Curated annotation (Swiss-Prot):
Protein name (record): Uncharacterized protein aq_1680
Regions annotated as coiled coil: 143-205
Keyword Coiled coil: yes
Record's keyword terms, sorted: Coiled coil
Length: 265
């Protein structure tokens, strides 16, 4: 607030200085003109012989009087402006004093707050060790309880995981035995006839059209068909099958031809 008022007053002061400067310049000009009129009056007053010269002298006298009056008016106005300038200067000084006082009060408040904070910190320093010991105890107890719970949970998780691994190994062993049995079992005559008939049809049919028919066959028969056609065509057919069905058929194919997968890729 004080800053804004001071800025306004300073602008008024600048305007007054400008006006006073203009008056001083005008005053100097009038004084110069007055000197010229006085010199002219002195020169003409020495030889006044005619009525015309008397009138001219009176005219010069009138101009001198007018100039003097104007100078007096300017002087009065100039003094008024100077007085106003001094008043403004005093007001600005007062505002500056108030601003300085406000700054000092602010500094005092900041110092007081800092002292209060220092006193509070001193108190906190005394209390902190007690709180630290209390919360450390709580935290330690909580950590111990958590560690015990984690240990119990870990044991339970380990048991579940171990059970899952055992079940998975058991299933894998069963699958391995099935594959071994299938590998040893030869195709029947009926399966061989169906196989020869289908191979010819499969070779001619587009992969995306024949794939649904192949995946509906028994996995072992489907594998025998795919092993007897071109490997590229077999790969295309497998790619168009249901992934689960294709996986079952691949088990039989790999038992008969372990390098089949690499050749298809």
């Amino acid at each position: 607030m004080f800053k804004r008022i001071r800025e306004i007053k300073e602008k008024e002061q600048e305007e007054l200085v400008r006006k006073i400067s203009e008056l001083l310049a005008l005053e100097r000009e009038l004084e110069r003109k007055l000197e010229e009129l006085l010199r002219e009056y002195d020169r003409k007053s020495q030889s006044v012989n005619t009525l015309n010269e008397i009138f001219k002298l009176k005219a010069i006298t009138r101009k001198i009087e007018e100039t003097v009056d104007y100078l007096e008016e300017l002087n009065v106005k100039k003094e008024e402006l100077k007085e106003k300038y001094l008043e403004l200067k005093g007001e600005i000084k007062s505002i500056e004093i108030l601003e300085e006082r406000k700054k000092r009060e602010k500094i005092k408040k900041e110092i007081a707050v800092s002292l209060q904070e220092l006193g509070f910190m001193h108190l906190v320093k005394k209390i902190i060790p007690v709180f630290f010991m209390f919360f450390s105890f709580l935290f330690s107890e909580s950590a111990t309880q958590k560690a015990l719970k984690d240990s119990i949970n870990l044991k339970e998780d380990y048991k579940v995981l171990l059970k899952l691994i055992e079940e998975k190994l058991k299933k894998l062993e069963e699958e391995r035995k099935k594959l071994e049995a299938l590998q040893k079992t030869p195709l029947t005559e009926e399966e061989k006839k169906k196989l020869e008939k289908l191979i010819k049809s499969v070779e001619k049919a587009p992969a995306d059209e024949i794939a649904p028919a192949i995946e509906n066959l028994p996995p072992k028969l489907a594998a025998e068909i795919l092993l007897r056609i071109k490997e590229r065509k077999a790969g295309q057919i497998l790619a168009n099958m249901n992934p689960q069905k294709a996986s079952e058929i691949m088990k039989y194919i790999l038992e008969r031809n372990p390098s089949f997968n690499a050749q298809v890729d």
